[in-house]
C-alpha cells in the first residue's frame, strides 16, 4: 500500500495495493561541519536498536573514500574509531536477506569505495537486478538485497548522473517498500528516498540530519520534515531540497516542530528496560485517569456517532483491542469489532462512510495496520489512532489521534504501551456509558495496585514461581470474559521473552481439546477476578488440576484449587490492567533464569513494518 498522507488529509486519496514488504531497521545520518561522527552516529543507533539488532555499521568520509566499521551482533559497549568528518551515517539491522554476518551488515559500498548505501526494506526483484549487474561485471561482497542499490547507482553516477538523479532512477527500479540513504564522498550531501518505511529529516543550524525515528533527532533539533512516499530528499549542511521521485521537480518543504517530550531514554538505575518499563505502568495509568478527559470524550463521541467501530491491532495491540471489545460491551452496551490488522482486508466489506477504524499501535508504523487504515479511508470511514510515537505514520494520517503517553518503550516487548491502551479504552467505555467518574476511580485504584504490587515484593514472589517452573517446556493459561484476552497476552509475553511454549485459552474451551495437552506437573496460570466469571474459572482450574496441572492463581482471593497464589487487587473492570503485571514479571524472570536478554528477544523487532 502506497500512502500519500497529504492527500489523505486534503480529502482525496491514491492507493496502490501491492504484495510488498518493508523490514525493520534503524537509520541515522549527519551532514554538516566536521565532527566526531562515529560516536554521534553510534549513539543515535543505540536509541534505534529496538528496530533491529542483528548487526550494525557506521560510515564516514575519510578523504577520497568511505571509511566503514560494522559487525554482527548487538551494539552493546562497542566503540568506533572513524575519522572526524562532515558526513556520516549508520544502520542497525534486522536481517531478511543474507545471514547475520559482518559482511552482510550495512553500509554497503560500490567497488571503488566512493558510494555507500544503507537500506530499510525488502527489494522484491533483487535477484533479477543482481543477475543483470553480475552480467555487466559487478562484483558482490555480500548476500544482501541491499547491495544491488549501490551498484545500480554506481553505474549511473559514472555515466554522468548527479547523485540525486542516480538515486531517483535506481529507486524507481526497486520493487517493494523501501527506504534508502546514499552517500557520495565527492559530494557533501546525503540523498534519501522512501515508500512506507519512515524517514524524518532533521533541520539544524549548519547541519542537517535524517533518521528512521524522531527519538534519534531531538537531541540535535526539533525542526523536522516527515518525508512522504516517493519524495527524494537531498540533504546538505545548509539546505534540504525535496524532489518528486518520478519527475525530479522540486517540491515545497513542509517544516514541522516536534513539540512533545520524548521522555527519559536511560535505564534510571534499573538493570534493563523491561523492568524499568513495567515499573512505570502505574504512572501511565494514573496519567490517563487524571489527564485524558478531553481525549476520551472526543473518542467516545466519535464512537457514538459511528455505525460500526473496528479496533485494529497486531500482536499485543490486538489483545488490547479484544479487551476493548469486551469493555465496550460490558460497560457501554456498545458493540465494537476487534480485528487483527493482517485479517482486516477480509472484513473490509462491512466498512461504510459511517464506520470508525481505530488503530492501536505502539510504533504507529505497523504495516498491516497502515494498510487497514488506508482501506478504511478509501471507503469513507473515519480514522482514529491510539499510538505511542508522536509524528508516526498512523498519528499523522488519523482524523483523531490519541497519544498513549507511555514514554519511550525501548524493550522490544510492549508492556506499558499495552497498559496505556487498556486504560484509555476503559475510560472511554465508561465515558460513553456516562460513568466517567467510576472509570477514573477504578483506574486510580489500578494505578495504586500496580505500584503497590512492586513495592510490596510482588516481583520477588513471581521470581520464586519462575524458579519452580523454569524447566517446564509448556505453560497453559486460562481466562474468561475481560480476562480471556489477558490470557492471550500473558502467553504472548511469556513466549516472546523466555522462549517457553505458552498458550492462552478461553477457559470454556478446555473440554474441546485443550485438556488433552496436560500432563503431570504442567504449570497452568489462572486469572480469577472477583466477577461473574469466577465460579466458572475455578471450575475449569479444578479440571486442569485433576489432570495433573500445577495451578498458579492470579486472583484477589485465595482458593484451594490454587497450588500457588499470586494475590492482586480487586479493581473491578480494570482487572486486565492489574492482572497483566504478574504475567509480565513471570516472563521476565523466566527469561533471566534461562539466561536470555529480556530487552532484545531473538528474531523480534519492535517497529514491525513487515507485511
Residue spans of the language-model regions?
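Glycine-rich oxoanion-binding loops at beta->alpha junctions
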Residues: 91-103, 286-300, 324-360, 366, ...
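Glycine-rich phosphate-binding loops that contact phosphosugars or nucleotide phosphates
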Residues: 301-445, 480, 527-573, 586
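Conserved short alpha-helical segments that host acidic/polar catalytic motifs at enzyme active sites
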Residues: 13-267, 271, 280, 286-290, ...
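Active-site phosphate/pyrophosphate-binding segments
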Residues: 274, 280-310, 379, 400-523, ...
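Internal helix-turn-beta structural module
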Residues: 570-592, 596-598
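Short helix-capping/linker segments at secondary-structure and domain boundaries
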Residues: 34-37, 155-162, 188-189, 430-439, ...
Amino acid at each position: 500500500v502506497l500512502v500519500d498522507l497529504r492527500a489523505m488529509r486534503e480529502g482525496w486519496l491514491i492507493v496502490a495495493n501491492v504484495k510488498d514488504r518493508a523490514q525493520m531497521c534503524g537509520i541515522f545520518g549527519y551532514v554538516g561541519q566536521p565532527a566526531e561522527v562515529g560516536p554521534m552516529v553510534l549513539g543515535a543507533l543505540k536509541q534505534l536498536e529496538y528496530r533491529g539488532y542483528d548487526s550494525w555499521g557506521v560510515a564516514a568520509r575519510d578523504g577520497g573514500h568511505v571509511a566503514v566499521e560494522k559487525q554482527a551482533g548487538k551494539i552493546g559497549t562497542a566503540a568506533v574509531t572513524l575519522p572526524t568528518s562532515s558526513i556520516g551515517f549508520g544502520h542497525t539491522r534486522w536481517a531478511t536477506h543474507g545471514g547475520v554476518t559482518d559482511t552482510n551488515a550495512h553500509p554497503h559500498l560500490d567497488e571503488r569505495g566512493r558510494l555507500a548505501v544503507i537500506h530499510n526494506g525488502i527489494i522484491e526483484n533483487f535477484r533479477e537486478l543482481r543477475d543483470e549487474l553480475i552480467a555487466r561485471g559487478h562484483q558482490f561482497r555480500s548476500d544482501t538485497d541491499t547491495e544491488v542499490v549501490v551498484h545500480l547507482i554506481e553505474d549511473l553516477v559514472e555515466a554522468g548522473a548527479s547523485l540525486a538523479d542516480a538515486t531517483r532512477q535506481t529507486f524507481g527500479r526497486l520493487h517493494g517498500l523501501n527506504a534508502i540513504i546514499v552517500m557520495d564522498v565527492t559530494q557533501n550531501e546525503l540523498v534519501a528516498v522512501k515508500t512506507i518505511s519512515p524517514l524524518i529529516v532533521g533541520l539544524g543550524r549548519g547541519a542537517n540530519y535524517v533518521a528512521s525515528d524522531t527519538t534519534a533527532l531531538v537531541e540535535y533539533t526539533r525542526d523536522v520534515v516527515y518525508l512522504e512516499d516517493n519524495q527524494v530528499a537531498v540533504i546538505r549542511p545548509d539546505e534540504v531540497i525535496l524532489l518528486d521521485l518520478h519527475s525530479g521537480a522540486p517540491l515545497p518543504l513542509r517544516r514541522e516542530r516536534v513539540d512533545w517530550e520524548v521522555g527519559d531514554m536511560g535505564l534510571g538505575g534499573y538493570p534493563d528496560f523491561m523492568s524499568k518499563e513495567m515499573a512505570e505502568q502505574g504512572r501511565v495509568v494514573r496519567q490517563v485517569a487524571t489527564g485524558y478527559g478531553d481525549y476520551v470524550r472526543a473518542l467516545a463521541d466519535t464512537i457514538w456517532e459511528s455505525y460500526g467501530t473496528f479496533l485494529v491491532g497486531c500482536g499485543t495491540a490486538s489483545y488490547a483491542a479484544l479487551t476493548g471489545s469486551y469493555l465496550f460491551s460490558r460497560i457501554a452496551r456498545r458493540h465494537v469489532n476487534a480485528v487483527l490488522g493482517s485479517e482486516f482486508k477480509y472484513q473490509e466489506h462491512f466498512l461504510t462512510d459511517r464506520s470508525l477504524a481505530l488503530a492501536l499501535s505502539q510504533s504507529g508504523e505497523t504495516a498491516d495496520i497502515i494498510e487497514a487504515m488506508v482501506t478504511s479511508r478509501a471507503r469513507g470511514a473515519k480514522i482514529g489512532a491510539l499510538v505511542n510515537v508522536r509524528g508516526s505514520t498512523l498519528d499523522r494520517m488519523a482524523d483523531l489521534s490519541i497519544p498513549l503517553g507511555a514514554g519511550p518503550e525501548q524493550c522490544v516487548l510492549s508492556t506499558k504501551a499495552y497498559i496505556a491502551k487498556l486504560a484509555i479504552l476503559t475510560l472511554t467505555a465508561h465515558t460513553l456509558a456516562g460513568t466517567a467518574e467510576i472509570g477514573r476511580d477504578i483506574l486510580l485504584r489500578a494505578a495504586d495496585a500496580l505500584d503497590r504490587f512492586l513495592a510490596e515484593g510482588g516481583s520477588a514472589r513471581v521470581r520464586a514461581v519462575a524458579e519452580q517452573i523454569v524447566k517446564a517446556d509448556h505453560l497453559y493459561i486460562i481466562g474468561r470474559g475481560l480476562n480471556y484476552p489477558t490470557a492471550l497476552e500473558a502467553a504472548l509475553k511469556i513466549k516472546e521473552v523466555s522462549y517457553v511454549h505458552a498458550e492462552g485459552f478461553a477457559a470454556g474451551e478446555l473440554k474441546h481439546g485443550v485438556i488433552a495437552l496436560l500432563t503431570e506437573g504442567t504449570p497452568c496460570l489462572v486469572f480469577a477476578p472477583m466477577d461473574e466469571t469466577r465460579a466458572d474459572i475455578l471450575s475449569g482450574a479444578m479440571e486442569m488440576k485433576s489432570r495433573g496441572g500445577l495451578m498458579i492463581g492470579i486472583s484477589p482471593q485465595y482458593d484451594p484449587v490454587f497450588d500457588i497464589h499470586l494475590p492482586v487487587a480487586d479493581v473491578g473492570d480494570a482487572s486486565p490492567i492489574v492482572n497483566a503485571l504478574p504475567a509480565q514479571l513471570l516472563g521476565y524472570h523466566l527469561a533471566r533464569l534461562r539466561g536470555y536478554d529480556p530487552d532484545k528477544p531473538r528474531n523480534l523487532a519492535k517497529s514491525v513494518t513487515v507485511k
